[in-house]
Design a protein with these regions (language model features):
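Helix-to-loop junctions at the C-terminal end of transmembrane segments
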Residues: 57-71, 154, 281-293, 377-378
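C-terminal transmembrane helical hairpin of 12-TM major facilitator-type secondary transporters
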Residues: 295-338
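Short amphipathic helix-loop junctions that connect adjacent transmembrane helices
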Residues: 28-42, 250-266
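Intracellular juxtamembrane helix-capping segments at the cytosolic ends
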Residues: 111-125, 333-346
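Helix-loop-helix hairpin linking two adjacent transmembrane segments in secondary transporters
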Residues: 135-186
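Primarily marks hydrophobic transmembrane alpha-helices of the MFS/SLC 12-helix fold
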Residues: 72-75, 79, 297-298
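Interfacial helix-cap and linker-helix signal at transmembrane-aqueous boundaries
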Residues: 33-34, 65-66, 152-157, 256-257, ...
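Helix-breaking motifs and short loop linkers at transmembrane-helix boundaries and internal kinks
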Residues: 38, 70, 91-96, 261, ...
Length: 429
C-alpha cells in the first residue's frame, strides 16, 4: 500500500464504506429479521444485546492480530462481516439460531471496527491527511444511502435474504479490494518491501533525512505500549461521545412522534438529518480536527451541549429538529478527533492494540447510551431526557483539559512525495 497507489490511498475509505453498507442494511432490515425469526419484541430485544456481547471480546483481541499480521486483516474481516449477514439469514428461523447468528455478526463487526480504525489511523499518521475523520464521514454517508436502498429492496421483495445478499456482494467486494491494497503493509512505518526501499533511495536527500529522523523517534519509543491508562482515559471520554451520539440517533424520531405528533414519514426526517449532518461535519471538518484537536473537542462539545438543551426545551417541531442537527454537528466530530489524537503518540508496532483499548472502552458508551436515555425518558418524558444527553457532553467538556496532560502527541505534517517515484511503505497509503 503506497501513496502512489489509488487503491492504497482509498483503502481506509473503502473499508469504512463497506462497514456503513452493512450497518445501513442491518438497521433497515431489523423488522424483517424479527418476523423471520418469529419472536416478539422482548425476546428480539434480548437477542440484539448479543451484538455487544460478541463485539466486545472481538475488539479486545483484534488489535493484537493487526499488529502481528498486518493491515490486510481489515479487508479480510470486512469480507467476513458481509458473509456473516448472509449466514444470519440462513440460521435465524428459530430463536437459538437467531441468537447465534447475531452473536457472530457482533464479533465480526467488533473485529472489523478495530481493524479499519487502525488502518485509518496508520494512513493518517503516514500521510498527514485527515483520514480518520473522512473515513468516518464515508461510514455515515453509506449508512444513510444503504439503509434507503435496503428499505426499498425489502419493500419490493419482502425478502431478508435478498437484502443481506445484496449487501454481502458490495461488502465482500470492498473487503477484497482493501485486503489486496494492504496485502504487503504492516502497521510499522518502517516495514518497507525491498522494492520500496530501492525507490526510497531515489528520494531527495532532505526527504530521506526526514524519514530517518522519524524512524529514530519510533525506535526510541517503540519498545512497549505507552500509557495504557492514558488510552483508557481517551476511550472513556469517547464513551461519553458515543453515548450522546447514539442517544440522538436512536431517539430523535421518537421525540418528533411523542412530543410533536409527527407522522412516521416526518419523524424519519430526524435520524436522516442527523446522519447527513454527521457525514458533512466529518468531511468538512477533517483538517481542523487533525490540526487543532483540543479546540475541536471544546467547540464540538459546546455545540452538542447547546443542541441537547435546545432539543429538550424546543416549543416547536422545527426548533427540535434544529437542536437535533446542532447535536449532530457537535457529536459527529468528537470520537474521530479523540481517536486521531489518542493514537498519535503510539508507536507503530502497537497501534492495533492501542486502537483496541480506545475503541473497546468507547463502545461501552455506544451500548449504554440508548438504555441511559430510556431510563431518563421513563422518568421525565422523551423531550426532557435530552437534558441528560446534554449533561454527557457537558461532562465531556469538563474532561477535555485532562487530555493534553496524558502525553505529548506528535505533530501531524504532510509528507511530500515525488509524483514520478514510488514511495516507500513508510510513506503509507
Amino acid at each position: 500500500m503506497t501513496e502512489a497507489s489509488l487503491p492504497g490511498r482509498a483503502a481506509p475509505f473503502l473499508g469504512f464504506a463497506g462497514f456503513g453498507v452493512f450497518w445501513g442494511v442491518w438497521g433497515a432490515c431489523l423488522p424483517l429479521l424479527r418476523a423471520h425469526a418469529g419472536v416478539g419484541d422482548a425476546r428480539f430485544g434480548v437477542a440484539l444485546l448479543l451484538v455487544g456481547a460478541g463485539a466486545l471480546p472481538a475488539m479486545l483481541l483484534t488489535g493484537r492480530l493487526v499488529d502481528a499480521v498486518g493491515l490486510r486483516v481489515a479487508g479480510m474481516l470486512l469480507t467476513l462481516l458481509g458473509v456473516a449477514g448472509v449466514v444470519l439469514c440462513a440460521v435465524s428461523s428459530g430463536y437459538a439460531g437467531l441468537c447465534a447468528g447475531i452473536l457472530a455478526v457482533g464479533a465480526a463487526s467488533g473485529a472489523t471496527d478495530v481493524a479499519i480504525n487502525t488502518l485509518a489511523a496508520t494512513a493518517e499518521k503516514r500521510t498527514g491527511r485527515p483520514v480518520v475523520a473522512r473515513s468516518h464521514a464515508a461510514f455515515s454517508a453509506t449508512v444513510a444511502a444503504s439503509s434507503l436502498a435496503a428499505g426499498a429492496l425489502a419493500a419490493a421483495t419482502g425478502s431478508l435474504l435478498a437484502a443481506f445478499a445484496a449487501a454481502a456482494v458490495v461488502v465482500v467486494a470492498l473487503g477484497t479490494v482493501v485486503a489486496a491494497a494492504t496485502r504487503s503493509t504492516t502497521v510499522r512505518d518502517g516495514a518497507a518491501p525491498d522494492g520500496d526501499q530501492a525507490a526510497a533511495a531515489q528520494e531527495p536527500a532532505g526527504h530521506r533525512d526526514e524519514q530517518a529522523d522519524g524512524a529514530a523517534v519510533r525506535a526510541e519509543g517503540g519498545g512497549r505500549l505507552p500509557g495504557r491508562g492514558a488510552l483508557l482515559v481517551v476511550g472513556g471520554v469517547g464513551a461519553l461521545a458515543f453515548a450522546a451520539e447514539n442517544a440522538f440517533q436512536t431517539w430523535a424520531a421518537v421525540l418528533l412522534t411523542d412530543a410533536f405528533a409527527a407522522s412516521p414519514a416526518l419523524a424519519a426526517v430526524a435520524p436522516a438529518a442527523f446522519a447527513t449532518t454527521a457525514a458533512l461535519a466529518r468531511l468538512a471538518g477533517g483538517p481542523v480536527m487533525l490540526r487543532r484537536p483540543i479546540a475541536t473537542l471544546v467547540t464540538a462539545g459546546l455545540i452538542a451541549t447547546a443542541g441537547g438543551v435546545l432539543t429538550a426545551f424546543a416549543p416547536s417541531l422545527q426548533l427540535a429538529l434544529a437542536g437535533v442537527v446542532a447535536a449532530a454537528l457537535g457529536t459527529a466530530t468528537l470520537f474521530p478527533t479523540l481517536l486521531s489524537y489518542g493514537l498519535r503518540p503510539v508507536p507503530d508496532a502497537f497501534r492495533g492494540r492501542a486502537t483496541s483499548a480506545i475503541s473497546t472502552v468507547a463502545y461501552l458508551g455506544f451500548l449504554a447510551g440508548p438504555a441511559y436515555f430510556g431510563l431518563l425518558a421513563d422518568a421525565g418524558g422523551v423531550q426532557r431526557a435530552f437534558l441528560g444527553v446534554a449533561a454527557l457532553t457537558g461532562l465531556l467538556l469538563a474532561a477535555v483539559p485532562v487530555l493534553p496532560r496524558l502525553g505529548r502527541p506528535e505533530p501531524i505534517t504532510p509528507r511530500r512525495t515525488r509524483p514520478d517515484a514510488r514511495p516507500s511503505a513508510s510513506n503509507g497509503p
